[in-house]
């Protein structure tokens, strides 16, 4: 683990790590990934949901802190449906769009929106009978195409097919990104959770921020917050990794603090109150 502003002691408690934001909630932001963080990972992504007790804690946190937002690889509108709290912000498609609190139409990065046509055309081209037979699920996220193999009858064969898709995507000049049993094909326009978080905080009057996530895409958010600290635009960043059987080693290395699964995130939300 890294330190918040230097090395973190292994004995550092959750309450101690969060004291910097608990002491000044009106100047603090709480940012959380959704899948694997607020919502447990499930066999089929469409079945994922945020447990009611977690949602209740998140509502209480949103009433206490200056800014609370969910930062997701899903569309912003999909993330809001999952979380079902309209009074917080949502960063969707890995930073490509932002749905402000109470908003109904996400603000999509114009260049990102234009570039999505190539990804949609690629997705339509690679969908074939083999993917259907292997039960690889293709997800259309407008500007991003995702291919999930979690829960396939033969996950090894399904992953091999998805890796062939990745090779084709790279050959066509598209960007590939791997997550927890999912491949994302993205346009060449650079979007990531770090850029999304920076964009979100640009208008926020906060001195400290906590980010909580479980996957490789969340590392971009960690780095984005730390860059803001280095630039003097944010006083403190606390990066919390959510541990699971599939935790990327880089996440454990870069996190200031680790919690165990969505249940650990729930405890963290309680500690913020």
Kindly label every feature range from the protein language model.
Residues 2-14, 25, 194-273:
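Mg2+-dependent phosphoryl-transfer enzymes with acidic/Ser/Thr/Gly-rich catalytic loops
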Residues 38-48, 180-189:
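Glycine-rich phosphate-binding "P-loop"
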Residues 83-87, 172, 235, 253-255:
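Short, structured coil segments at secondary-structure junctions
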Residues 133-235:
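Conserved acidic, metal-coordinating active-site core of Asp-based
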Residues 49-141:
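Active-site phosphate-binding/coordination module
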Residues 28-30, 88, 209:
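The start of beta-strands in P-loop NTPase/AAA+ ATPase cores
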Residues 1-34, 38-42, 46, 53, ...:
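Non-catalytic pre-domain segments flanking phosphatase-related domains
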Residues 20-24, 28-30, 57-65, 225:
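A short, Lys/Arg-enriched amphipathic alpha-helix followed by its capping loop at the start of a domain
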């Amino acid at each position: 683990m890294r330190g918040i502003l230097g090395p973190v002691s292994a004995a550092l408690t959750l309450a101690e790590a969060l004291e910097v934001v608990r002491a000044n909630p009106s100047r603090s932001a709480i940012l959380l990934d959704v899948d694997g963080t607020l919502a447990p990972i499930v066999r089929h992504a469409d079945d994922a949901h945020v447990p009611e007790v977690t949602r209740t804690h998140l509502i209480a946190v949103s009433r206490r802190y200056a800014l609370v937002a969910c930062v997701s690889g899903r569309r912003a509108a999909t993330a809001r449906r999952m979380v079902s709290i309209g009074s917080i912000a949502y960063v969707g498609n890995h930073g490509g769009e932002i749905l402000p609190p109470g908003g109904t139409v996400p603000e999509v990065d114009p260049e990102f929106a234009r570039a999505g046509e190539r990804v949609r055309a690629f997705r339509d081209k690679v969908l074939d009978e083999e993917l259907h037979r292997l039960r690889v699920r293709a997800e259309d996220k407008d500007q991003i195409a995702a291919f999930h193999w979690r829960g396939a009858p033969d996950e090894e064969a399904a992953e091999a097919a998805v890796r062939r898709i990745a090779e084709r995507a790279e050959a066509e000049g598209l960007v590939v990104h791997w997550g927890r049993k999912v491949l994302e094909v993205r346009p060449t326009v650079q979007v990531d959770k770090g850029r999304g978080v920076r964009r979100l905080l640009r208008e926020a009057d906060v001195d400290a921020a906590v980010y909580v996530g479980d996957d490789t895409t969340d590392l971009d958010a960690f780095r984005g917050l730390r860059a803001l600290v280095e630039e003097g635009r944010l006083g403190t960043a606390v990066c919390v990794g959510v541990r699971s059987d599939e935790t990327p080693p880089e996440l454990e290395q870069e996190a200031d603090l680790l919690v165990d699964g969505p249940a650990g995130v729930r405890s963290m939300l309680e500690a913020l109150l």
